Amino acid sequence: MSGGIMDEEIEIPPFFLCPISLEIMKDPVIVSTGITYDRDSIEKWLFAGKKNSCPVTKQDITDADLTPNHTLRRLIQSWCTLNASYGVERIPTPRPPICKSEIEKLIRDSASSHENQVKCLKRLRQIVSENATNKRCLEAAGVPEFLANIVSNDSENGSLTDEALNLLYHLETSETVLKNLLNNKKDNNIVKSLTKIMQRGMYESRVYATLLLKNILEVADPMQSMTLKPEVFTEVVQILDDRISQKATKAAMHILVNICPWGRNRHKAVEAGVISVIIELLMDESFTSERRGPEMAMVVLDLLCQCAEGRAEFLNHGAAIAVVCKKILRVSQTASDRAVRVLLSVGRFCATPALLHEMLQLGVVAKLCLVLQVSCGGKTKEKAKELLKLHARVWKDSPCLPKNMILAYPC
């Protein structure tokens, strides 16, 4: 238990414990429903978890402001002092959250010189690291817009841009602010700025730029997604190809999942060379060691194989069929379903004697028959059956098909 307390020697008053962490509260605060929580726990619940209900009462928290419960905090401190002989450590008095006016002054003063800008960013980094309440205060004071302006306009000073980019990511800004940044056309477009950093930036900045671009494009409306420039696709694919970090790779893949449902974007992604890069990734054990990466990769391949250019690029890669076939029944239901959809797309629209023979030799037909036999999603089975029936004349009586699979072949 917290503070080195021996629970067999001393009983902790239950109202000293945070309802979330069940540990002694170090900084008790009251939410709008009247329940007291430890600040760190409720901030994680509200901001990191993006929940807006009270964990105890389940009522909506209408006001995100947290009111310090000074009376309870002093009572806990007194209790800690009285029980020091039992090994109870006194909780320190927490520092008060930063105020909005102080932040606004900090931003105003930074405009006077480059040195003041550097000092401002250092102070902001310190404030961000203290608690989530400070992050919300910085957001209210316009810090995300201030940082985005540096990222967009201060290309001559790489270190300043890198620091602003780092801070902007760690602010964990709300969807509303992300939309404002995306819609702000007064300064340089934030998507364009992040794309440039992904192209020219240092290692860490490329990672943060990719993570930020993912967050921003998640709140984009369909028209904003459909009008993305080809350079965005080029740099996202380059991030995947460079494999600079697992975080960046997953973020880049997530971006493609979000923007490739739109027809125009599929063509841009194919032209950027994403299909061959994804197939190479699917052959990389470090990428396939976790389920989510291969799942997203299969989703993107499925989306891109819905256009003729995508199917052509897919079949241009010598390992494509084998790699996709291998993921069926090996990763997850989602991955299996998307893999079968990819094979159905190429089998329906690109069937040639050579392709059908290749699919037979690589075990695709046997794998599809297996899908029909095992516990698998109904839609996945339907698509597997559709592909098998489509080419039954070629596949069903082939000596390449194992005898035990011939019995499973749909009539």
Swiss-Prot record:
Keywords: Cytoplasm, Plant defense, Repeat, Transferase, Ubl conjugation, Ubl conjugation pathway
Result when mutating residue 45 to A: Loss of autoubiquitination
Post-translational modification: Auto-ubiquitinated.
CDD domains according to UniProt: RING-Ubox_PUB
Null allele phenotype: Increased tolerance to drought stress.
One GO BP: response to water deprivation
Highest rank taxon of the organism: Eukaryota
Pfam entry (one): U-box
EC number: 2.3.2.27
TM region positions: none
ARM repeat copies, ranges: 132-173, 175-203, 221-261, 263-306
Induction annotation: By cold, drought and salt stresses, bacterial elicitor flg22, and bacterial and oomycete pathogens.
Gene Ontology CC entries for this record: cytosol
Keyword flag Transferase: yes
Pathway: Protein modification; protein ubiquitination
GO molecular function, one term: ubiquitin-protein transferase activity
Broad enzyme group: transferase
SUPFAM superfamilies (alphabetical): ARM repeat, RING/U-box
Reaction catalysis annotation: S-ubiquitinyl-[E2 ubiquitin-conjugating enzyme]-L-cysteine + [acceptor protein]-L-lysine = [E2 ubiquitin-conjugating enzyme]-L-cysteine + N(6)-ubiquitinyl-[acceptor protein]-L-lysine
Occurrences of domain U-box (ranges): 11-86
Record-linked InterPro entries: ARM-like, ARM-type_fold, PUB22/23/24-like, RING-Ubox_PUB, Ubox_domain, Znf_RING/FYVE/PHD
Stated role: E3 ubiquitin-protein ligase that negatively regulates water stress response. May control in coordination with PUB23 a drought signaling pathway by ubiquitinating cytosolic RPN12a. Acts as a negative regulator of the immunity triggered by the pathogen-associated molecular patterns (PAMPs), in association with PUB22 and PUB24.
PANTHER family: E3 UBIQUITIN-PROTEIN LIGASE PUB23, WDSAM1 PROTEIN
Protein name: E3 ubiquitin-protein ligase PUB23
Organism, as annotated: Arabidopsis thaliana
Phylogenetic classification of the source organism: Eukaryota, Viridiplantae, Streptophyta, Embryophyta, Tracheophyta
Gene that this sequence comes from: PUB23
